[in-house]
Every structure is written in structure tokens, then in C-alpha cells.
């Protein structure tokens, strides 16, 4: 009986691990990549983090605190699978550098994100799915962005412009800051 109980407990624990890893459908991450996903606690501050090659799983309140500390910031909701709206990360980073805007990329997919991580100045982020354990893909992403942006803004865009922590506009295309 003890062995059976231990086996069932181990299987249940394995299921929890699988849920976290498969939340972004990345069954084929290497051990090094899995170890480079940093699951932050609710109280972890993102201010002062540098791009150290890890992806930080964060909640909307952590992102809000980070954005308030920046005069101008751009949050890029990046997904390599949404081909019609994907803007190369290096292009968005270059645009931000030219316009004195801090870029923060939030990815919903890990495998491709690790190939892009060196193209951004700041750390790359993902949603901390522990807070959104329902339907991981669509509903949880909507809930995350609704909390980050407020009820008035929708997740349908990929670029979210912030000034001193306030979302001032959302778009799917890069706009020349000097001409707007």
C-alpha cells in the first residue's frame, strides 16, 4: 500500500510539472532552457533586472511596477505563431533604441523566445501561469493583459505604449515617434 501511495503521489506531482512546462506547448525544451525560466514570486521586483539569458515568468502587477518606473516603455506581446502581426524583435529593439523607449517583450512561447533573447536589451518575460491555471492559452492571456492594461484596453494588439506606467496607445505596427 505504501508503494502504491508513493507512486500515485509521484504521478500527481509529475502532472503539476507537466502543466507548467506544457502551458506554452514546449515539450521539447532542453534542460538548460527549462532551468533558464525563472518563476518569480508575487513580491519579486523587476526593476534593475538585466538580460541574463533567462525568461522571467511574471504577473501583471510586477509589470505595472516596472512600467511606472519608466518614462517611456513599449510592451511587445510577441508570439512567433501569429505570422501576420509578427515584427522581428531586433527591429522593435532598434526602433526603441532610436526613440529612447524601454522595450519589454512578453512571450507566450519559450522555445522560439530563447533564440531571440539576445536581440533585446532588457530581460524577456512570460506570463506567470500559476495565477491563470484555467484555459492556459486564450483565457489566461486575456486575463493577464486585462489586468496589465485595465478594462478599457484589449489584448488584440501586439504593441502597448506606456508613459510613466499608463498605457497611452495600442497598435500592431511600429509608428515613427518623430512624426506622430
Each PLM stretch: what is its role?
Residues 24-44:
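Post-signal peptide N-terminal segment of mature Sec-exported envelope proteins
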Residues 1-5:
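Sec-dependent signal peptide recognition
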Residues 111-155:
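Thioredoxin-like thiol-disulfide oxidoreductase module
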Residues 37-73, 78:
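Post-signal-peptide N-terminal segment of Sec-exported extracytoplasmic proteins
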Residues 63-92, 104-106:
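Short active-site neighborhood of thiol/selenol oxidoreductases, capturing the structured segment around
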Residues 16-19:
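Bacterial signal peptide processing site
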Residues 11-14:
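C-terminal motif of bacterial Sec signal peptides marking the signal peptidase cleavage site
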Residues 154-171:
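A short, hydrophobic beta-strand/beta-hairpin element that forms part of a small beta-sheet core
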